[in-house]
Amino acid sequence: MIIARGAGVLLAMICIGFALPVHATSPVDFTNDIIPLMSRLGCNASACHGKAEGQNGFKLSVFAHDPVGDFRALTRESRGRRISPTAPADSLLLRKISGAVGHGGGVRAPRNSRAYSLFLQWIKNGTPYEIGGRPTLTRIRLEPSRQTAAFNASQPLKVMAEFSDNTHRDVTWLSIFHSNDTGMATVDEKGIVTIGNSVGQTSVMARYQGKVATFQAIVPRPGPKVTYPHLPNHNFIDPIVDSHLKRLNIIPSPLSDDATFLRRVYLDIAGRLPTANESETFLSDSTSGKRSGLVDALLETPEFADYWALKWADLLRVDRLKLGHEDAHRYYKWIHESLSKNKPLDHLARELLTAEGPLTEQPAGFFYRAANNTGDMAAMVSQVFLGVRITCAECHQHPYDRWTQQDYHAMRGFFQQVTTKNSAGGLALLAEGNPTIKHPRTGAIIQPYPLGESMPEEPPQGDRRHVLANWMTHPENPYFARNLVNRLWAHFLGKGLITPVDDLRETNPPSNPELLDALAASLVKNNYDLKKMIRIITHSRTYQLSSKPNATNLSDEQNFSRALFRRLPAEVLMDAVCDVTGVDEKFDGVPRGYRAVQLWDSQVQHYFLKLFGRPARATVCECERVTGASMGQALHLMNSPNIQTKLAHEGGRIKRLTLEHEDDADIVRQLYLSAFSRSPSRDEMNTGLQYLGSRRFQRRKAVEDLAWSLMNSFEFIFNH
């Protein structure tokens, strides 16, 4: 049989296998049994025969995305030398996996193993590709699917496969397991979960035949059940969080003090520190509603639009190298204006998706120029607006999600009509024609359809992007609102309900599903109003909690029982240094007086911003912005000539303080208000006065030293 003669010959070979009698045993075929087994043994992993060039002359498709090709490689390539139909036990396949002959992957299936027996039975049965009449797999489930577990507990999982004829089968031994957080729980190849010593919620994924299922473990804090205090609810967020904390045997920290809240909310909403005067005004205010009033005021400041335009410019890839200087600036101005006017987020998404016409008049269309091709566009839209990563599915079945190659290319199809042409008004974006998308492996035509939907028989009429935009912004869309509120929650609370924030999938469940659903419903109810959602989140008691832990939540970094420490973003920290020293930073290509948060151009060269993790906007992944602390950052803050120059600047704040205040206590207090938005404690005041007093003949230099020490403190570098 010659495969090269056509698909019909291959199909005939696939249907009948080799011309051997089928033994009277339980049916075994390639698609339902051998493919899962090879995946289970790691044969088609990217580190083995699934790598691009294969391994030792034998190549399988990674994660079995091309079963027909894998069948051909195993049974027909190299003159069929891997299978011996007349002497099944002598097949090279069996001799390799059992260790009878040398195998780079080692012994994968000893002769007395269940895996070896299954391979042997398949060969004896004639190596059928499929057995006619066998039911198809519809879903898998894990037993148990959810459980409360103690520290160091073990739980065996069972994977049950459900088929089209309503039968089910235990396929645990053919399944692949993966833990989302190995610090909280590990899982072995047999599906036995071992809980660690961390409090919270975690999940373990099982995969079989492209289907996935999850097991969720809730791990409460050990010890006697705590008496949960009666706490006031600021809004719907708090009782949902409290209910979760009760299950975990955790008591939340108390509310933060006014100074902590003041600094936190300025940094989170406006991306800057409050001035000393702003701090004094707020701290001296005794009215009961001053916190919500401050939030309302900050949302109407120009700094709000500056900071949130920076965040969206990262996501939407405002990149001068990609777009050119003028076009990148137009794109940024459109984003900034949209946020300044509080454009509903569904409108913003729709305008980006359906932009058409001259780009000078429709700057939202630059979103399309930020992508390299239609596949890149599909991946960008999915990740930015749905929080779904589909890039893996370009080449193969997503290993941790349900997305297939067909799903990926169906999303591509929505953008296949989009072209650019020169017009009287400059470069214009058009959506025209009815181009087709073909499956790269099978050649079958794929009609565009959104993620999770079914493929229609005919392509959408007109501009296909409107179909996608309507689906995406529909109130019942399972991704759009959840993705947006998860990103907002991560910004304000330091961690998403789903982590990473742009990786929403069935196998990566939220730490508090009820809260994510409630936040998403609130966003939809409030017509996707960004400012309203910010008010809701910042008004909650949960957001306003202190970062100081108690005995029950000392190790909690997942369940929002206390505020988390967050290193300031690069631009915000640079501006904070400028605010404390009173000396602006000079950035190349922009007038003096520009704050780092206002920089629309991510390609402006600046050592500090690069060191502290400013993204280059090469991708839409939140992970491109580095928020962790490093030794290099600490050394730079301590030794930077630029910072030393700002401290000693003749027009800077340090010189003004020494000239305007004869009382050293006033200077110490002003520095603390500027850096920390609070007055110094008694001990801090005494330490500051003692230091300044000991250097009275070098008073200005001593004030510089004190300011330097504050800017190098944990309290300055982090939001808390």
Residues covered by each model-derived region:
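Solvent-exposed helix-loop boundary motif
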Residues: 24-116, 133-160, 167-234, 264, ...
